[in-house]
């Protein structure tokens, strides 16, 4: 299944369907979900990173129960915006997961999303390191997914 740009992916959604956002890390996959009006992304859970098939089974339950119509995965571009080995791996992983889940997918730049969330949790939320570790992945997924939502709105210019 091909990967879609934000506007095309949004246009594939049926009314009332949600979008699932993933921020895959080496140990944890942050999971976020949009509301049905596609205005707001909220953190959902952090999944332990396992083999693709195992994670796909866990995510398939969310897809079914939450009426998810599309998947957006964080793309770890290099700081200069180039498409390096990590971005290639994320793209391949996203395509494979999209096929397993049977829903269309797209990628969205996740550069510095975890850093931005960590800064917020330290400065504004005054969270301890242990508590931050519990929530940073799912919050980074929500941060990334909100960026995708904002860019994919019909009035937003096409940038991808």
UniProtKB/Swiss-Prot annotation:
Molecular-function GO terms, alphabetical: nuclease activity
The keyword Cytoplasm appears for this protein: yes
Coiled-coil stretches noted in the UniProt entry, renumbered to this chain: none
UniProt cross-references to CDD domains, sorted A to Z: YqgF
GO biological process terms on file: rRNA 5'-end processing
Coarse class of the protein's main subcellular location: cytoplasm
EC numbers for this chain: 3.1.-.-
Keywords: Cytoplasm, Hydrolase, Nuclease, Ribosome biogenesis
Compartments where found: Cytoplasm
GO CC annotation terms, alphabetical: cytosol
Family affiliation: Belongs to the YqgF nuclease family.
Purpose: Could be a nuclease involved in processing of the 5'-end of pre-16S rRNA.
The protein's name: Putative pre-16S rRNA nuclease
